[in-house]
A protein has these predicted regions:
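Glycine-rich, mobile lid/loop segments that gate access to catalytic sites or pores
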Residues: 1-17
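C-terminal nucleotide
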Residues: 22-173, 188-228
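Short, small-residue alpha-helix embedded
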Residues: 182-188
Length: 228
């Protein structure tokens, strides 16, 4: 995190780095970025595959990420005089956000709205994982993708094309993976739909954009560790 802050100019969070070290095979992790406490939730979607689709569109994240962070911080600054106990958007309620709506630029409101919605979605997905409810997990993935596209504005036409295509193919869940502005979608695909989805994604994406996406079957593995 310090390297990204000090050398690339991207004021990123800690989530990616933390997951890369503390990841656990067959589990998703819920991380509290304030206390650094974390909890594992079993991810065992029998009858499904995790499929990564790479748009091969490169993204430059630095200032775009910083702009969104400033938007979120601005909402907190506006609310602090009336709510001195809040520190970050995690402390802001939906009612508080509606109070701020008339006091901040519309783009700041939308970006903060995405963050509050994502907080709710994380909790809903953790609950669904404990119940083995992968239909709900998938639905929340789509909600996240379109929130990132329409409210947070970190998607791109190629990623949105893949998300729409996934829905048409009956894919259970799809969302942008990573920082956005290109890169990949992660897809939760039923086994019986896998072949059709992969073939359709390759064919239609190539026809639309003139180059083929790369498709990978992926599994959740352990974090980085010393190899003997």
């Amino acid at each position: 995190q310090a390297t990204e802050h000090n050398y690339t100019g991207c004021n990123c969070g800690i989530m990616d780095q933390f997951a890369s070290v503390f990841g656990k095979a067959g589990c998703l992790m819920r991380l509290d970025c304030r206390s650094m406490e974390f909890e594992y939730f079993p991810f065992e979607p029998k009858g499904y595959r995790l499929v990564l689709v790479n748009t091969n569109v490169k993204h430059k994240l630095g200032d775009e990420y910083n702009q969104r962070r400033r938007s979120c911080e601005h909402v907190v600054e506006v609310l602090k005089p009336n709510y001195p106990g809040i520190e970050t958007l995690r402390d802001v309620t939906w009612e508080m956000l509606e109070e701020a709506k008339a006091l901040v630029p519309e783009v700041d409101y939308r970006r903060a709205k995405y963050v509050l919605g994502e907080k709710d979605r994380v909790l809903a997905v953790c609950d669904a994982l404990e119940k083995g409810d992968y239909e709900t997990v998938g639905a929340k993935m789509y909600e996240t993708h379109w929130g990132m596209s329409k409210d947070y504005e970190v998607s791109c036409v190629e990623l949105d094309f893949l998300a729409e295509l996934a829905k048409e193919c009956g894919v259970t869940g799809c969302r942008v993976m990573g920082g956005g502005f290109g890169g990949c979608t992660i897809n939760l695909v039923k086994d019986e739909l896998y072949d059709n989805f992969v073939e359709t994604a390759k064919t239609k994406f190539t026809a639309e954009f003139g180059h083929a996406p790369l498709v990978y079957d992926v599994v959740i593995g352990d974090g980085s560790r010393k190899l003997d």
